[in-house]
């Protein structure tokens, strides 16, 4: 069944940060470049900057040191400070693939004591969904990335 799309079980990660939802959302989106690992890029050149444009229909992408840009997907939902949903157009070879129908949804939920629970869900819908799920659920995938985010909120 070459090219058939598969839906894998979603990858879910949760972190709690000592910040209001407004700050948690702002660090995740407006300060995305401050915490996203530079090693996690798809361009041929090293990544210079990671960007999430602050509106539905915006891009999320990387700017590389050679001046090139690589789109990762688009902003599907922009609901500050509660939720952002991003399309994920990257396959398991870490190449742009418009046939990938995956989404990354991040929710920011206020809890007692000034804590925000940040819930990330990566819904994978692609021909290589099982491989992609294994990669993004690996220790250096969303777990490590969300740890970087948590540290940035605390800084």
Task: Please provide the spans of the model-predicted regions.
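Hydrophobic ligand-binding cavity/cleft-lining segments
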Residues: 1-47
């Amino acid at each position: 069944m070459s090219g058939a799309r598969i839906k894998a079980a979603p990858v879910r990660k949760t972190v709690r940060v000592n910040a209001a939802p407004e700050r948690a959302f702002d660090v995740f989106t407006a300060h995305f470049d401050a915490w996203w690992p530079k090693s996690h890029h798809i361009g041929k050149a090293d990544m210079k900057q990671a960007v999430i444009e602050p509106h539905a229909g915006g891009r999320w992408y990387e700017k590389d040191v050679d001046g090139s840009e690589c789109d990762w997907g688009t902003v599907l939902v922009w609901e500050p400070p509660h939720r952002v949903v991003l399309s994920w157009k990257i396959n398991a070879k870490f190449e742009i693939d418009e046939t990938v129908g995956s989404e990354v949804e991040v929710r920011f939920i206020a809890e007692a004591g000034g804590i925000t629970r940040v819930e990330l869900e990566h819904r994978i819908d692609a021909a290589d969904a099982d491989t992609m799920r294994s990669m993004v659920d690996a220790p250096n995938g969303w777990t490590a990335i969300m740890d970087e985010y948590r540290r940035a909120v605390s800084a």
